[in-house]
Each structure stands twice: as structure tokens, then as C-alpha cells.
Amino acid sequence: VMTVKDLHSDIVYIPSSADDGVSGHGPYRAVEPSFYFENPTSKFHSERGMPAIMDYKSLSQMLTSGHLWPIDDVWGQHDFTRTGAQGDTAFIGMTRRRFGDQALESAERFAKYAQWINYDGYRAMYEANNVNRKGLLIWMSHSAWPSLAWQTYDYWFRPTGACAAAV
């Protein structure tokens, strides 16, 4: 079997944007902003992110009224999952600790308060990686379909709290 290296030995191939000379592999879930400062990397960080909840208007476009609230498995189909990299329970817990149960009374309230969680998290990612100008690329700036993770703006081009932190 011929490989790219066999056919084109002068081409550098990096098999993953998170390996080989950079620091990557998340975290991709919500962590306290202090985590980024307490766990510095000595390299450019090529992949980092957290759930990025869109505004209520976008949520209403993405989910039918029967699945808009409370959070259910349909949210999981749009990347807000209990298991896996996103770990929505961490995000929900953060929202509850910061804003109380009122933040979880409706989709509209959750979307509103989630912007602050996104802003604080993404701002901390950038500020912590600014030390010694190491740099950071988030995973990812936008999604190819309506998603609740890793985006600075949503499928309908509406900015999330992460966008405000990134500028």
C-alpha cells in the first residue's frame, strides 16, 4: 500500500490539528475560567472549546416547541450532550451556581444566562493563552448545522457570548 509519504516525501503531513508540535485535545466542555490559568500549556493550543448556547431566536428556529424546554435528547442531537466531550451537565451546573434556579426556568432564560457563561469561559481561554503569546485556536468558530457547541456565531450567523469574548 502506497502512502502519501511514499508518493510525496517532501510534503509534511500532520494527522491531527491537536498533535505534533502544538497542544490540543480540549477541554471541550465547560470548566471554571480559573482552570485555564491554573493549567497553562507551554505550546500554541490548537483545539479548545465549550458548549456555546445560541440566543433564544436561534434556539426557537432549531428546536420545535415540544423540544424547546426542558432540555431533552433532541438537544443532544445538536451537540448538547450528557456524555462525550461537551458534558452539558457541567454547563448547566455552572449556570445554576452563577445565576440560580431562575436561569433554568425556561429556554429563553437559559439562552440569556448562557451567554454570560460562554463569555466568561471563552474570555478566560484567550486571556490565559495570551501569557507569553502562546496563542489559541478554538474548536470551532462556527458549525455547519444548528449546534450548541464550540461556536462563536451560530448557524444563522448570530453571535454567541463566545464571539464577544473573542474580539
Show where each model-derived region lies:
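Substrate-binding clefts and catalytic carboxylate motifs of secreted carbohydrate-active enzymes
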Residues: 4-5, 32-167
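Short, surface-exposed recognition loops and adjoining beta-strand edges that mediate ligand/DNA contacts
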Residues: 14-36
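Acidic/polar loop patches that form or flank catalytic/metal-binding clefts of enzymes
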Residues: 8-17, 135-137
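Active-site groove signature of glycoside hydrolases
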Residues: 1
